[in-house]
Amino acid sequence: ISIIYKFITGSIPPKKELKDLPFRLQKINQNTINDSKSTNFHSLKFAICEASKIFKDFALILLGNPKKEGFKEIEISNPALVVICGKHKDEIFRCVKHENKVLCENLSLAIKEIKKANIKNILFSPGYPSGDDYINFEERGKAFSKLIERNFGT
């Protein structure tokens, strides 16, 4: 692309710095990844793969409305624990195949459940649109980051 740019303009293209997207695999502390932007199975699968490279053992938090994904059954194998929370938790629970999954009413209780299970690493990659729990992924991501800071620090 830079050769084409130079040919057309006669100059070298300016360097562009890529910025991390907020809430897209955002590491908020040594043990926590906030991937609130994950609103579908493909982004969830990618996040699990990336978290598996960073953490030996981790908990995954799922949250949102599975309707957009067609209530598709998904098999999740890597996390030690899958915590499903929010207003659509029962629907998500039926969609997810995992040997160790639990239900929680909300994000705050999900974090407490992970602490109780003594799992140090957390991947928050909801896998679904926000649904009735949050306005959008940004509000959801901010809420998660605040809860992590309150419970673990940064």
List each model region and its residues.
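Nucleotide phosphate-binding/pyrophosphate-handling subdomain across enzymes
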Residues: 1-80
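Glycine/aspartate-rich loop-and-adjacent alpha/beta segment that forms the canonical ThDP
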Residues: 126-154
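C-terminal helical cap/extension that packs against the catalytic core
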Residues: 66-121
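Residue-level preference for the first positions of well-ordered beta-strands
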Residues: 57-59, 119-123
